[in-house]
């Protein structure tokens, strides 16, 4: 197989939305940094939602972006937690996919603490092929050929071959 046609993991984004600032967000940041080993970044609300008590610009969630070997290792652990099954509706047109994990206590080394509670998290995986750099570089930037884009079928085949995942 042509090495430029092979699919690889570009990045894994781990997101915890808590809906409010304060102790709950601080606890979520601590948990996400323990699980991933990286420092989280806070995300702010894009609009005001009075029904939920959220103001525009208020920090309401945190996320971590993993790349390289750390992303692959975290993805393996996360896929085992969801029992090697991903819904077919989890894929977008570019071959990226997302899935949720209901309890952070499913990860190794995490235990339930009544003071903290239980947090769920979202895992988003972005896939790429070699040669994507020509579309992202600043000097002599080119359009990416359509055959170089990752399709949904390519992503499903990659998951089946690499991580033994069943797409439902």
Curated annotation (Swiss-Prot):
Alphabetized, the UniProt keywords read: Ribonucleoprotein, Ribosomal protein, RNA-binding, rRNA-binding, tRNA-binding
What InterPro entries does UniProt report for this protein, alphabetically?
Answer: Ribosomal_uL5, Ribosomal_uL5_arc, Ribosomal_uL5_C, Ribosomal_uL5_dom_sf, Ribosomal_uL5_N
CC per GO annotation: ribonucleoprotein complex; ribosome
Q: Does the record bear rRNA-binding in its keywords? A: yes
GO biological process, any: translation
- Pfam families, per this entry? Ribosomal_L5, Ribosomal_L5_C
Q: Name one GO molecular function term.
A: tRNA binding
Signal peptide annotation: none
**Self-association and partners:** Part of the 50S ribosomal subunit; contacts the 5S rRNA and probably tRNA. Forms a bridge to the 30S subunit in the 70S ribosome.
UniProt record similarity statement: Belongs to the universal ribosomal protein uL5 family.
Q: What does this protein do?
A: This is one of the proteins that bind and probably mediate the attachment of the 5S RNA into the large ribosomal subunit, where it forms part of the central protuberance. In the 70S ribosome it contacts protein S13 of the 30S subunit (bridge B1b), connecting the 2 subunits; this bridge is implicated in subunit movement. May contact the P site tRNA; the 5S rRNA and some of its associated proteins might help stabilize positioning of ribosome-bound tRNAs.
Q: What is this protein called?
A: Large ribosomal subunit protein uL5
Native source species: Methanospirillum hungatei JF-1 (strain ATCC 27890 / DSM 864 / NBRC 100397 / JF-1)
